[in-house]
Amino acid sequence: RLSELFEQARVRRQAAAPLAAIGPAGVGGVAFVVLCLAGALASDRRDAELRLLLARGGSRAGIVGRLLGEGAVTVLPAAAAAAALAVLLLPTPRLAPALLSAAAVTLLALLAFPVRAAVLLAPPRPAARWRRPVGELLVLTVTGAAVLEVRRRGISPAGSDVDPLLVAAPLLLALCGGLLLARLQPVVTGWLARAAGRGSGLIGFLGLARAARGSGSSGARARGRSGPSVLPLVALLLAITTGGFGAAVLQSVDSARLGVVRLTVGGDAAISAPGNSPLPDGLAKAAGELPGVRTSVPLWIDHDSFVLGTAQGTTQVTLVVAEPAAYAELSRTLGCGAFDPALLAGGGAGPADAPVPALFSADLARQATPGTYVLRAGSGGELRARVAGVVDCTPAQPGPGGVTVVLPAGPATALIHGVDRPNRWFGLGSPAADRLRALVSATRPAAGAAAPAAAPGAGRYPTAQALPVDEAYPVRTSAEAVAELAADPLQRSAQRLFWASVAAAAGFALLAVLLTLMRNVPERAALLARLRTMGLRRRQGVALILAEALPHTLAAALGGALVAAAAVALLGPAMDLSTLVGASVPTGVRLTAGPVLIPAVGLAALVAAAVLVEAATSGRRQITTELRAGDQR
């Protein structure tokens, strides 16, 4: 038995590992972009110094070695302290993954600046126009292969370890979106700049024109190299795609978990009586009047009824008697056997022996023959019924293979013994479990009081008065069942890891935008100072910086939302969420607007606020400082 539990835990952990790895992979991708951007910023700032060293006889290898030494002074102690802090705060018996991750980050941080400097100091070569298209085509090919593999095998194939290609599929889609956006954004911004140029104002035209061609004309750009303007777009797209895809997965998990729980409970709340014993008088009505109850469905269930006249002669069924409109709403909300309540109407008209309309389960309908049937209840009494509709399941008995018959409460009440006293109550809404239990305790018959007459055949079940209140009339709510399912450590850890990854990716994306702004601070401050001498007001300077920086942010937010939606549409149908839900559910992630738009709008607002603060700070620089003699910017 213990070995089976260990094997079950191993299989669940193996199934959840790829889903939990998507978030950290997104953080790693954004962090990689940020480190590359930091290396580009450092190399641009020290470009003149490095070229001077090369002109004075220094070799490229010597300069790169010097930069490695400079970086080691700060990177190695910081990496060691960070790794030690991680081990102390989050102790684990297996240190190898943590140490390997720390070593990879350290190596990347140490090499980003020297590698960028080595590229800048390389002898100029003829521009190869095919280099960028070939690289983009390679990324597109790898992305297509990853998406096809995910659609074919799923993100977490049974019995296999984490496949990096499958886990990286959302990130590759974001990378493709970033490359496409880097092609389209300058063109669209250029159109907007030309449209703004036809107006009377100059602020919008200048800002959009600088955004279209890329701000800054010094450093690497002045020598014909393209600046790292695509990196902030990629960072924002990675963060938004990771956040949107992760939020869609988590919402689908919550939705699927609620759906499973609702089917298990029978709604958002349920009260049942033991056996065929009825609920206390007035309990169903009082429960329906509690705050938070949207729909009240009292019903009567009998598992010992029989249908006479089927292909097998006599078939034992579960008989459900409920008010048609309320039961139809319950079925529609639960997604279990939805039907039109008009199908069960008309059973009360006509002679007393007229057949009552009934809903047959699919299994029973396959045994049915044309005509009417005799329905004999286990509590006593019988009636004639006709098939008014077929349902594949019903909330009163949602399990597969159930043979059920649903009757309307009105016509059946006078023909079946005890059906006027419901023995089940289902509710929709958000009722409080403690209020329901208090209501059950208040309406339960006293120990010395006469018990209500039970239906015939209920004697083999324990009476309600002989049981504790929690066992006599058990109360179940979907909120408690969802909390119980979500309390699983594996699911809770995966969910927390996902949200932590989304927050970290957003932080790194914001850092990427700030690094981009810092890269152009000297040139932008000099431009503002010169424009101030020509009558530019401080408020107009802030507007100019916003007009220059916000098109990138808005384009990244819109593109990230579209890429996140594409990732959910392409990869979602292949994701099995059963491990995260805690129960077997159909494969697939639902695409909804909320989880995709909220990360995009939130990150765009955060970046816009950071740009506004930087713009207001840059506008306070002194003109005399920026226009000093000998300024080389």
Where are these regions (language model features)?
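Juxtamembrane segments of multi-pass membrane proteins
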Residues: 155-173, 177-346
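Short helix-loop junctions at transmembrane helix boundaries
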Residues: 71, 80-99, 150-165, 561-602, ...
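Hydrophobic secondary-structure segments that place a key small or acidic residue at a functional site
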Residues: 339-411
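Interfacial "coupling" helices/loops that link adjacent transmembrane helices in transporter permeases
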Residues: 33-72, 511-554
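Membrane transport/envelope proteins' first extracytoplasmic loop
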Residues: 1-31, 99, 155-167, 180, ...
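Short cytosolic juxtamembrane segments of multi-pass membrane proteins
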Residues: 122-128, 619-633
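Hydrophobic alpha-helical segments
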Residues: 51-54, 58-185
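Alpha-helical transmembrane segments of integral membrane proteins
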Residues: 20-37, 78, 104, 139, ...
